[in-house]
């Protein structure tokens, strides 16, 4: 598949990227991938939702969002695109994010299939805003190697992003904005991964630790509101890398 990825991907935008220990890198790429078979409807497993108790704030998991084969494809795609230190268009304080990342726009068909699988389990309304029938096409994928971690933080809220109709530019959507983080684990402990749990806090107290599992997705509130969830990515203690993708769940403005 490597040759297919290389021929069906391109740099669609370049932004200033923040480095893990401080400083910036100009021209950090965001890629566009035209790979129609990234997710296939016939591969869809039967997902299951499990709520997480973190003191009344919204947090839940959906199991088996992707198959192992689909997760392996996503890992191969992102490795071919190339992980790097700089995160384009994202500002984090020095020392908060210690991992490598690649940001890309997934095909609209793949994101529509992903939304179809999770939509029945998502809140249909939050703070009076209705669930948008589309996920942001921008996927922020992270690779954690031994010793990497993401220290305590609250995720920011974002507009949605996709391609212009002619596919030549990245465009920012209007009329919709993110309210939920989706963390999609592409591998897990069953692959030999050690450490790297996502820990969730409420009022400074650890309330839950979510172990990475292939195909599992974790959801929680983000942005500048009292229901946003403080969380961290624990230190990876083994030699098997951890792969996780952040995807934004959108709600109408």
Where are these regions (language model features)?
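Fe(II)/2-oxoglutarate oxygenase catalytic core
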Residues: 1-219, 223-253
């Amino acid at each position: 598949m490597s040759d297919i990825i290389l021929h069906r991907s391109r740099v669609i935008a370049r932004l200033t990227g923040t480095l893990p220990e401080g400083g910036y890198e100009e021209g950090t790429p965001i890629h566009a991938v035209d790979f129609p078979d990234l997710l296939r409807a016939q591969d869809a497993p039967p997902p299951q939702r499990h709520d997480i108790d973190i003191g009344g704030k919204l947090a839940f998991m959906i199991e088996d969002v992707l198959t192992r084969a689909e997760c392996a494809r996503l890992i191969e795609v992102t490795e071919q695109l190339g992980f790097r230190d700089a995160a384009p268009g994202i500002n984090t304080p020095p020392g908060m994010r210690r991992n490598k990342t690649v940001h890309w726009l997934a095909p609209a068909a793949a994101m529509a299939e992903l939304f179809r699988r999770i939509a029945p389990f998502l809140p249909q309304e939050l703070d009076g805003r209705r669930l948008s029938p589309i996920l942001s096409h921008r996927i922020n994928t992270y690779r954690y190697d031994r010793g990497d971690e993401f220290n305590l933080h609250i995720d920011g809220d974002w507009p949605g992003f996709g391609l212009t109709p002619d596919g030549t530019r990245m465009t920012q959507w209007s009329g919709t904005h993110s309210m939920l983080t989706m963390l999609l684990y592409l591998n897990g402990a069953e692959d030999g991964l050690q450490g790297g749990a996502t820990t969730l806090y409420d009022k400074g107290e650890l309330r839950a630790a979510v172990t990475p599992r292939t195909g599992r997705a974790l959801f929680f509130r983000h942005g500048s509101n009292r229901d946003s969830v403080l969380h961290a990515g624990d230190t990876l203690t083994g030699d098997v890398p951890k792969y996780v993708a952040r995807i934004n769940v959108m709600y109408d403005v």
